[in-house]
């Protein structure tokens, strides 16, 4: 089955691949990444196309959940196994930790995100990156009444100056970056980071710098967040070590 419309319109640092295990899958363009494909893999795929091959271990953690939640969880594990295979790692089981975080094989860092339509996964050898974080969001889901809990005063002031459509998109972008950063930092610190503890600073059309009020503030200063549209109504945020992306002028 084809990718949904939002994934068929590929983000500019993605390309669509047809064939092999990546049938109907959108994966990273590797001339945008300073790492070989054997060390770093990222992909986006429709949830409905990530249901097989599945294992009982994919279902056990969500056995009592509603069907939609089961499908989302399974999609993350199915796609993650495919990407791990691409970097030479055979992992039948990707369990969940106490905070529902994926427990990756030794030597691997990774991140999984999904919404109601699509699943995004990034995996890498920990010899080439410190950590990774990914998040995909539907534009418009961050209601204005949530801003005080999510954004710094500076971020809120910036949002208030925007027109409604741009405001809705940028609020989603800021939220998505902070979600991706949380996933990046958690395997390192094993600690909680609040949304307002992280400040996001736009650098150009698609990249953002971060600062954070956490015990190891260098974690934020050493990363770069890349954000790209997925069709007309979604965004995907990737947080990686700042040395990983080649600098792109994406408009």
Where are these regions (language model features)?
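Core catalytic alpha/beta fold that binds nucleotide/phospho-ligands
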Residues: 2-132, 136-251
């Amino acid at each position: 089955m084809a990718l949904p419309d939002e994934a068929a319109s590929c983000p500019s640092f993605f390309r669509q691949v047809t064939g092999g295990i990546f049938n109907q899958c959108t994966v990273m363009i590797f001339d945008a990444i300073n790492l070989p494909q054997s060390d770093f893999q990222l992909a986006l795929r429709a949830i409905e196309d990530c249901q097989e091959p599945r294992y009982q271990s994919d279902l056990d953690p969500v056995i009592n959940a509603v069907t939609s939640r089961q499908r989302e969880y399974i999609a993350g594990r199915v796609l993650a196994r495919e990407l791990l295979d691409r970097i030479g790692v055979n992992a039948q089981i990707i369990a969940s930790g106490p905070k529902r975080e994926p427990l990756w094989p030794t030597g691997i860092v990774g991140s999984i995100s999904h919404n109601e339509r699509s699943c995004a996964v990034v995996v890498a050898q920990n010899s080439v990156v410190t950590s990774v974080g990914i998040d995909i969001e539907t534009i418009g889901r961050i209601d204005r009444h949530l801003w005080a809990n999510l954004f710094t005063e500076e971020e809120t002031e910036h949002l208030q100056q925007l027109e409604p459509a741009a405001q809705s998109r940028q609020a989603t972008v800021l939220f998505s970056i902070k979600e991706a950063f949380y996933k990046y930092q958690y395997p390192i610190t094993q600690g909680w980071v609040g949304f307002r503890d992280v400040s996001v600073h736009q650098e150009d059309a698609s990249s953002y710098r971060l600062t954070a009020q956490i015990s190891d503030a260098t974690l934020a200063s050493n990363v770069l967040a890349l954000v790209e549209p997925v069709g007309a109504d979604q965004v995907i945020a990737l947080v990686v070590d700042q040395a990983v992306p080649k600098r792109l002028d994406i408009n």
